Amino acid sequence: MDLLKLKWQALAPTFSFSQLPVDSQQTFWDLQPRTTAAIDNWLAQNSNAILVLKGEEQFADLLRLQQYLMQHYFADQAVAVNGVHYQFQQPDANDFPTIEMRPAQSVQDNFAQRYWVKCADYLSPQSLFGQVLQLVNSNKIQLIPGLIHQVNGGILILSAAQLLSQFDLWQRLLSILQQQQFHWQLDDILQRQTCVIPPMTLKLKLIIVGSRDNLAEFETFQPDLYQLADYAEVAAYTDIEDQAQQQQWASYLCNLAQNELQCELDLSAINRIYQWLTRESEDRHLIANSPTQIITILKGALSYRANSNDNIINAEMVEQFYQQQCYQRDLLQQRSYQSILAEQVYIDTEGEEIGQINGLSVIEYPGVPYSFGEPSRISCLVQIGEGGEIVDVDRKNELAGNIHSKGMMIAQSCLSNILQLPSQLPFSASLVFEQSYTEIDGDSASLAMLCVLVSALAELPLPQNIAVTGAIDQFGLVHAVGGVNQKIEGFFAICQQRGLNGHQGVIIPAVVCNQLSLNQEVIAAVKAQQFHLWVVEDAAQALQILLQRDLIEMPDKTYHADNRPLNQLILQNIEQKSEHKSACSKWFSWLSAMKKA
């Protein structure tokens, strides 16, 4: 089945251009046409005072949005004379002052507009709405402006997380936005002294930036949010399907390096960063564009330069930083692999077994920003008999989720369809993820479950040196799964520690080739033909690789006893064992009757 084997060149992506882009002026916002168009429309239509943006909400991201708005909309505009000026008159020191208000006449007035656009890294009632201070041992009053006063007539940028943590701030802010009036809230002492502060007109626009989860939570507290606000998304990933898009993203990368770190990138570094970020997006045509994330990578790579005067980042420097990041985070991964290598968790990578196969899982721990793949032994036992069922042991013991259960049912339906079995199965089977003590979910093991079920029914051994991942439908077609890079590398790591023998490998869905961005050790092993990757489009191809037999009869092929198709072999086994069971049943009935006589 060499036609189904992947060549080493296909295991990691590279850009199609061979020279660095000449134009390195692309910015983050050049990669966000939907977002910038939405902001244009929001400002032009003036229908809603609020714009909700799905995006990263770190302060650096809010600041980046602030800078974009300033440069794009207010670059040539001085701050308008907008707002008010509060005047205090206090003829008698024993009385509270009389406070009068007039329109601001200059930007120096105490409640005049200070900014066109402003974001906040910290929110409190005082920082947002200002405060009224009564000086100690005195009846003097001081008014401190808040953010909303400083940006009166402009745009305020806040994160959804900030508002969720103090939702009462949002309720007051929404009231101000709707009424376009700001009323001072006085403490009890000042209220008793009948200190009156005139309310002021306040018109501003608000941008709320938040993650999808935070915005969903926000909407639960404010169900009519999207009746009050426009909505747009800051794309976390950029399309790079064609060469022009690739060069645009590479130009953006070079621009970040030059402006943020005063360094340069060579083509090898751009390709290595592309490979790194493809692992996150799991799509060679989608790549992360987060400035914060990319700058972190560039800073880390720059720390591995040979001398302090070297300001060109290459692939080797990026790779060193990547390996250092993995080393910092992979302690739990190494502990897991040690358990397998010490046979505390039994995973066989050599020989053959009937009804046993190595599936592949992605392991994630809460609070750990790192996931990894590891093999999982899936076993199957069958018993021939009418009215049988396939028992998912993990699901029955509430150790598997609904999607896993769905995958198991699809595997059963697929097998019944291939074998043309009656609705009442002529056999019983039990499938289990061996030595699995935590909850599992997902349908990426459904191809492996079908294969192990076929092995048990046909009584043919499966090679333990080949692991399998893939989801199937009822017709046996193999579909995409996630985490394919981690899964391949996890099985490879175990095989490598035990010694590569040139026969080990992984079967993956053909449709996930676009996800592949494997580490250099796997690529080198595939290049040396010490490790293999097979791509399959349907279950029949996977079973041909594993069992060296066709799943069903092929019209142009001659069959003998040693190469009979699997469906014939399974039906023959079921028939023979059913006859044997029937004969045994008759014998036991005769024996029972003799004893009674």
What does each of the following model-derived ranges do?
Residues R212, A229, V234-T238, S436, ...:
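Conserved P-loop NTPase motor cores
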Residues N214-L228, N519-A525:
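Short regulatory helix/loop adjacent to the ATP-binding pocket of P-loop NTPases
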Residues C380-V382:
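The structured alpha-helical core of multi-pass membrane proteins
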Residues M1-E219, A232-D242, S251-L267, N271-S376, ...:
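Conserved ASCE/P-loop NTPase catalytic core
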